[in-house]
Amino acid sequence: MELNAKPRKSQEKLAEGLIPAVAYNKDNNISFALDRKAFDRAFRQQSTTGLFDITVEGGETFPALVKTVQMDKRRRTPIHVDFYMVTYGEPIEVSVPVHTTGKSQGEIMGGLVDIVLHNLSIVAPGPRRIPQELTVDVSRLNIGDHITAGDVKLPEGCTLAVAADSVVISVLPPRMTADEAAAETQAAQVAGLVAAGELSEEAAAAVLEGDASIEEIKAEAHAAEGTQAEGSTEEGQQQ
């Protein structure tokens, strides 16, 4: 996509409707100004993976990718743009958005598809070979399954710039309700009391089935111990 720019000196006050921009690489640095509305429209179509051919009035035309866009927080409009100048035919590392397609088996069972890496770093063979997005089919994933960077199908000529075992997407188990979380906590507590010998298996079953609470079981056990102690005292006095 083409962008027309006006030359700009550092700290120069710009006319209404223009925003400052800079394009650079390891060997060059060019300052210029862009029409705010024209850039905003173009950027919405291209995003950070789209290639721009920038022509500076009275100067050269060069290819570049958007590096960063500074936005007006209140108006949500661009106020400054950094471009990275590239060279046709040379490999380039870029961060490409990851999108999913399909509905996973895990989702059908109540799970949640978690996109761990919303952008995947790859090396494209040249600026014109950069994909706008990477689409991943999640329809076969069950709860607990995941897709790594090595599983993602890349366009011909593109390679990963991250470890192949990096998790990109995973399917998480259903989120527990407050009641389910409380039940799980209680089960762990009961198991600990049984292991410590403070609760019998019969009493544990009663608690887990909702027939009694841990406090009630402990109170009954304490009362029984008190009754047993009183009986032992009476027997001693009779003797």
From Swiss-Prot:
Coiled-coil segments on the chain, per record: none
GO molecular function, one term: structural constituent of ribosome
InterPro entries hit by this protein: Rbsml_bL25/Gln-tRNA_synth_N, Ribosomal_bL25/Gln-tRNA_synth, Ribosomal_bL25_b-dom, Ribosomal_bL25_C, Ribosomal_bL25_long, Ribosomal_L25_dom, Ribosomal_uL5_bac-type
Quaternary structure annotation from Swiss-Prot or TrEMBL: Part of the 50S ribosomal subunit; part of the 5S rRNA/L5/L18/L25 subcomplex. Contacts the 5S rRNA. Binds to the 5S rRNA independently of L5 and L18.
Keyword set, alphabetical order: Ribonucleoprotein, Ribosomal protein, RNA-binding, rRNA-binding
Disordered: annotated span: 217-239
Superkingdom to which the source organism belongs: Bacteria
NCBIfam families in alphabetical order: bL25_bact_ctc, PRK05618.3-3
Family: Belongs to the bacterial ribosomal protein bL25 family. CTC subfamily.
Short name of one Pfam family: Ribosomal_L25p
Gene that encodes the chain: rplY
Function: This is one of the proteins that binds to the 5S RNA in the ribosome where it forms part of the central protuberance.
Protein name, per record: Large ribosomal subunit protein bL25
Taxonomic source organism: Deinococcus deserti (strain DSM 17065 / CIP 109153 / LMG 22923 / VCD115)
Biased composition (Polar residues): 229-239
Keyword Ribonucleoprotein: yes
